[in-house]
């Protein structure tokens, strides 16, 4: 069974889109940091705090503890999906943080977690924000 968490945030101000962009930019500017495996994965409250800073990503798990980020992107055709995946791959190499990628005709699905801790850490949200900048 897969659980899903989605940010349920009260939007303040008259322009929620601008607020969302400001939140993403803060994460986008950060660098992914390698995890040595001794770091604890984020708990639910930390996950919710960071989830508010990225748009359209869902937090899922398959066994009640190993949370991961997931987002599906839609495209006009296979080639556009492939171009997007190539850009994601380039960012992943630059950051040293590699998501699981699934794609086909008209879609790409990205799954992000920190494999060393089998959960979520700040770098996962940083990578998600960087991918959203494509």
Predicted regions and their residues:
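Long, contiguous binding/interaction regions
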Residues: 24-79, 86-107, 111-134
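Short, Lys/Arg-enriched N-terminal segments with co-localized hydrophobic residues
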Residues: 16-23
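Short, low-complexity, intrinsically disordered N-terminal modules
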Residues: 4-7
């Amino acid at each position: 069974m897969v659980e899903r968490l989605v940010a349920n945030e009260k939007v303040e101000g008259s322009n929620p889109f601008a607020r969302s962009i400001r939140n993403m930019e803060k994460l986008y500017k950060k660098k992914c940091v390698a995890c040595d495996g001794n770091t604890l994965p984020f708990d639910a409250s930390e996950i919710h705090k960071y989830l508010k800073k990225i748009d359209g990503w869902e937090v899922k798990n398959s066994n009640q503890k190993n949370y991961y980020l997931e987002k599906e992107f839609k495209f006009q055709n296979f080639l556009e999906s492939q171009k997007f995946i190539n850009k994601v791959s380039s960012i992943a190499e630059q950051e040293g943080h590699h998501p699981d990628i699934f794609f086909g005709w008209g879609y790409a699905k990205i799954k992000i977690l920190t494999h060393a801790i089998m959960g979520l850490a700040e770098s996962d949200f940083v990578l998600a924000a960087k991918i959203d900048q494509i």
